[in-house]
Swiss-Prot record:
Family in the record: Belongs to the universal ribosomal protein uS4 family.
Domain of life the protein comes from: Archaea
One GO process term, biological-process aspect: ribosomal small subunit biogenesis
GO CC annotations, alphabetized: small ribosomal subunit
Natural source organism: Korarchaeum cryptofilum (strain OPF8)
Chain's role: One of the primary rRNA binding proteins, it binds directly to 16S rRNA where it nucleates assembly of the body of the 30S subunit.
InterPro entries: Ribosomal_uS4 (IPR022801), Ribosomal_uS4_arc (IPR022802), Ribosomal_uS4_euk/arc (IPR005710), Ribosomal_uS4_N (IPR001912), S4_RNA-bd (IPR002942), S4_RNA-bd_sf (IPR036986)
Alphabetized Pfam families for the sequence: S4
Name of protein: Small ribosomal subunit protein uS4
GO molecular function, one term: rRNA binding
Domain S4 RNA-binding intervals: 102-164
Amino acid sequence: MGDIRKHRKKYERPYKPWDRRVLEETNRLAGYYGLRNKRELWRMSFLAKKYRRIARQLLAAPKSESWKVEPIIKKLQALGILSKDATLDDLLDLSVEQFLERRLQTIVWRKGFAKSPYMARQLITHGHIRVNGRRIRQPSYLVKIEEEDKIECLHPSCLEVEKEVR
């Protein structure tokens, strides 16, 4: 009969989607990171807002709930979003760009396997990229620090681009 958990949206639309400033910012980020649609950007923005909200709640919470801080900081450090010496106050400074930089699509592009984020997206969706020995077909996969060195490309075009970059 299905899962008994409550299904929630994984993104939040902007309050004023047709505001000029919001449109310019979303178009800039979507173009730079090669996102397919605005929903991908909203999903990453929702993640950043979620962790900022948790940080605000923990700052206001009594000392007896300080044990909740450590796992959240460790998770974001493993993803490479926070530095090793991060504190709870650093959670308040999270931005969408920090999450977009940790997507598999962006990392494949930055490593030089692809000439553009759009080419990186195509390589991933066609199954030419492996992370830690597993084929991953989601461009939005958030890459952990320990997995970053284990990204490999199985397509000959990756090798050509890699030679051009070096």
